[in-house]
């Protein structure tokens, strides 16, 4: 006993609790068979709580009708069915919306066609008012999209979320005699079309071709600037040329810096005027840069000096687009920082790794030389003590060339008296 509901944001498969709520399930199945829910909007969407649908006109409708009223054989509503075993304890439970009518005994809860779907867990507070008759078996991603919809203060989404089709997968109930299933989905009525806010395929922000072209140009310029920064032609991607520099080209090769400065000085104070020349030959490249103290002077010169004849040559002026000066300044600062960093590194390594200059090395060498001499004195003292202890007479070492028979090949004393003075543990066997 299942129904497939196709919406504008995805599909939902609802399994019905036929045994626990038979009349409610029958009403829902027969309304789906009559295509009553087609084009019904989702409204009253409360984030992480519930969403409501089932009225063909949405929040402006009359609340909907039950299937027996649609077939002109019954009242508009029927009594709500509550089952104590069914509670709102998880996401995806389907319940009927109820209305309260007065009866002779007490107030009575009745149902029509509207239903709600829970969008969160542990909503037991709905048990006393909304009777459960089904649960979502598939399509929880669709529920998440409905839950995340952008809505107004009343919970109605700005972009319409509607039921497109309802397909019955299993129906255990017999159809009423007057129920005739339509051959096709009915077209929406004019009243339903009047409730449309933003359609499914409607663009929220329409972009003209001019805006799209402008956006593409900006993105392309941004990419080119980043590329120039990476290869080193620009100091940084968003660098802008100076506004107080005028570019002059098509100059006569004989035109000098002083000539241009004299001609353009009537438009304002000139900070610098430079004709660009070849680095090797010094010949003029026939263009120059003139830097004024303010932007207004550049604009005056631009409008007044276009195609003016200077030294039999008509010049062309424009606002400068060069950032070479910024690049030179950036490179000089970068090199200065690098050199400072390298000097700091050298100082750090000199102190931490024990690297000294030549003068310090000489001082340490002298210090180590004195220590070595002191060690030599101590070693001679130890040798003297050793000789006295073992009776090793070093005077025999002076008889290297005397041919003394009491000395061995190593000029050591080999007399019997000396041998017996050694400890027995170190005595050689050949002397026994």
Curated annotation (Swiss-Prot):
Taxonomy, superkingdom: Eukaryota
Subcellular localization: Nucleus
EC number, UniProt record: 5.2.1.8
Induction / repression: Induced during the meiotic cycle.
Keyword Nucleus: yes
One GO term (biological process): regulation of transcription by RNA polymerase II
Modified residues (Phosphoserine): 206
Keywords: Isomerase, Nucleus, Phosphoprotein, RNA-binding, Rotamase
GO cellular component: chromatin; nucleus
A Pfam family this chain is assigned to: Pro_isomerase
Bias kind Basic and acidic residues: ranges: 341-366, 373-395, 406-432
Protein name: Peptidyl-prolyl cis-trans isomerase cyp6
Organism this protein belongs to: Schizosaccharomyces pombe (strain 972 / ATCC 24843) (Fission yeast)
This protein's encoding gene: cyp6
């Amino acid at each position: 006993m299942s129904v497939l509901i196709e919406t504008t944001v995805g599909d939902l498969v609802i399994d019905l609790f036929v045994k626990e709520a038979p009349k409610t399930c029958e009403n829902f199945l027969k309304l789906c068979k009559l295509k009553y829910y087609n084009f019904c909007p989702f409204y009253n969407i409360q984030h992480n709580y519930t969403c409501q649908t089932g009225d063909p006109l949405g929040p402006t409708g009359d609340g909907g009708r039950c299937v027996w009223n649609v077939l002109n054989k019954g009242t508009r509503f029927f009594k709500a069915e509550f089952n104590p075993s069914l509670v709102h304890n998880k996401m995806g439970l389907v319940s009927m919306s109820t209305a309260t009518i007065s009866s002779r005994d007490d107030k009575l809860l009745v149902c029509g066609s509207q239903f709600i779907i829970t969008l969160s867990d542990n909503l037991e507070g709905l048990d006393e008012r909304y009777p459960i008759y089904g649960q979502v078996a598939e399509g929880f991603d669709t529920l998440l999209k409905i839950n995340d919809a952008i809505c107004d203060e009343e919970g109605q989404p700005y972009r319409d979320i509607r039921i497109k089709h309802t397909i019955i997968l299993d129906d255990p109930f017999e159809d009423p005699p007057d129920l005739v299933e339509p051959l096709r989905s009915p077209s929406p009525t004019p009243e339903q079309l009047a409730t449309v806010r933003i359609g499914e395929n409607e663009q929220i922000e329409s972009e003209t071709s001019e805006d799209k072209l402008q956006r593409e140009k900006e993105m392309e310029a941004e990419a080119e600037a980043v590329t120039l920064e990476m290869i080193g032609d620009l100091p940084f991607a968003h660098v802008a040329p100076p506004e107080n520099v005028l570019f002059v080209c098509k100059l006569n090769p004989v035109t000098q810096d002083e000539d241009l400065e004299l001609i353009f000085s009537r438009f304002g104070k000139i900070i610098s005027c430079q004709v660009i020349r070849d680095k090797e030959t010094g010949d003029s490249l026939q263009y120059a840069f003139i830097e004024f103290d303010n932007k207004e002077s550049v604009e005056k010169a631009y409008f007044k000096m276009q195609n003016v004849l200077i030294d039999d040559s008509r010049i062309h002026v424009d606002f400068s687009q060069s950032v070479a000066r910024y690049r030179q300044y950036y490179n000089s600062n970068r090199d200065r920082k690098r050199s400072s960093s390298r000097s700091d590194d050298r100082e750090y390594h000199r102190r931490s790794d024990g690297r000294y200059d030549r003068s310090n090395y000489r001082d340490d060498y002298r210090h180590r030389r004195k220590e070595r001499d002191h060690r030599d004195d101590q070693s001679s003292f130890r040798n003297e003590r050793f000789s006295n202890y073992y009776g090793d007479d070093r005077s025999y070492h002076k008889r290297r060339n005397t041919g003394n028979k009491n000395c061995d090949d190593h000029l050591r004393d080999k007399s019997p008296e000396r041998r017996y003075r050694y400890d027995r543990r170190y005595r050689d066997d050949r002397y026994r």
